[in-house]
């Protein structure tokens, strides 16, 4: 999965997919009542990234729905996964469940079209703080009470705080999560980060007792760091330059081993070689 980073304006969806992304990451900010409000990152952000683009969250969802609904004039067949980077740092811990409920209702109405031929992309809820695990339970409760528990089949999870792998496993246990787990690891592209924790995550993914289904690394903009991440065995790379990742995947060393994921590749299944 080539994951376009900080795609917060509807116009950027076309831009990133046309550069080779089959997945996008979108920032979601919340108001003081835990309503998802804007798709907005804000400063500071990555070196060379554009961090001031934004939309109202529900408007962004409508644009995203068009981009992922077959038959729509804006449809991109390649766009199969969306990571919502949930900026829950502005919330009190006891608001996490409410944030999850409100997020689910927004998605149900504006993205899934109330379960009636809505957008088809898989969705990852990426949460920066393990203490906010109730966002997941609130999300699930809301979809169930709205009569659409089947949409949870399209939803996966990520804790993005680079926490100890054992602590992450524990948070999932508390949230009642037993699958659909992506594990991110990374740092802003302005800084260097080793691949030690990525290797631990990959080892967990590949062990029979692990909780992780997919591992992605962020934010990678250079060819050599792309090669290093692929050599470590990641499933996804988040980038400001999807074309760079696509180029490296075309190199002979990687062409035989990796391919770009399509809609038929289940993002919740661990890839077995």
Swiss-Prot record:
InterPro entries: PLC-like_Pdiesterase_TIM-brl (IPR017946). Binds 1 Mg(2+) ion per subunit. Pfam families: GDPD_2 (PF13653). GO terms for biological process: killing of cells of another organism; lipid catabolic process. Its cofactor is Mg(2+). It is an enzyme of class 4 (lyase). Expressed by the venom gland. It is found in: Secreted. One of its GO terms (molecular function) is metal ion binding. Keywords: Cytolysis, Dermonecrotic toxin, Disulfide bond, Glycoprotein, Hemolysis, Lipid degradation, Lipid metabolism, Lyase, Magnesium, Metal-binding, Secreted, Toxin. The active site is at residues 5, 41. Mg(2+) binds at residues 25, 27, 85. Dermonecrotic toxins cleave the phosphodiester linkage between the phosphate and headgroup of certain phospholipids (sphingolipid and lysolipid substrates), forming an alcohol (often choline) and a cyclic phosphate. This toxin acts on sphingomyelin (SM). It may also act on ceramide phosphoethanolamine (CPE), lysophosphatidylcholine (LPC) and lysophosphatidylethanolamine (LPE), but not on lysophosphatidylserine (LPS), and lysophosphatidylglycerol (LPG). It acts by transphosphatidylation, releasing exclusively cyclic phosphate products as second products. This is Dermonecrotic toxin LapSicTox-alphaIB1ai. It comes from Loxosceles apachea (Apache recluse spider). The lineage of its organism: Eukaryota, Metazoa, Ecdysozoa, Arthropoda, Chelicerata.
């Amino acid at each position: 999965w080539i994951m376009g980073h900080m795609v917060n304006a509807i116009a950027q969806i076309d831009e990133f997919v046309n550069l080779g992304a089959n997945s996008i990451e979108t920032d979601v900010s919340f108001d003081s009542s835990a309503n998802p409000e804007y798709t907005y990152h804000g400063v500071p952000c990555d070196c060379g990234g554009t961090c001031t683009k934004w939309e109202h969250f529900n408007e962004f969802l409508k644009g995203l729905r068009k981009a992922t609904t077959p038959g729509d004039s804006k449809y991109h067949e390649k766009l199969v996964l969306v990571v919502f980077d949930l900026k829950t740092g502005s919330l009190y811990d006891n608001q996490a469940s409410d944030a999850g409920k409100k997020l689910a209702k927004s998605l149900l109405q504006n993205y899934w079209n109330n379960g009636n031929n809505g957008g088809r992309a898989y969705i990852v809820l990426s949460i920066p703080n393990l203490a906010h695990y109730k966002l997941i339970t609130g999300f699930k409760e809301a979809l169930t009470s709205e009569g659409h528990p089947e949409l949870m089949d399209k939803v996966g999870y990520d804790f993005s705080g680079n926490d100890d792998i054992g602590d992450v496993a524990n948070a999932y246990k508390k949230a009642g999560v037993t699958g659909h787990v992506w594990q991110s690891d990374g740092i802003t592209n302005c800084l260097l980060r080793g691949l030690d924790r990525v290797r631990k995550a990959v080892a967990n993914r590949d062990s029979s007792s692990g909780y992780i289904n997919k591992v992605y690394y962020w934010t990678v903009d250079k060819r050599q760091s792309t090669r290093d991440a692929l050599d470590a065995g990641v499933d996804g790379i988040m980038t400001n330059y999807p074309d760079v990742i696509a180029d490296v995947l075309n190199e002979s060393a990687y062409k035989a081993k990796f391919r770009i994921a399509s809609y038929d590749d289940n993002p919740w299944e661990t890839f077995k070689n």
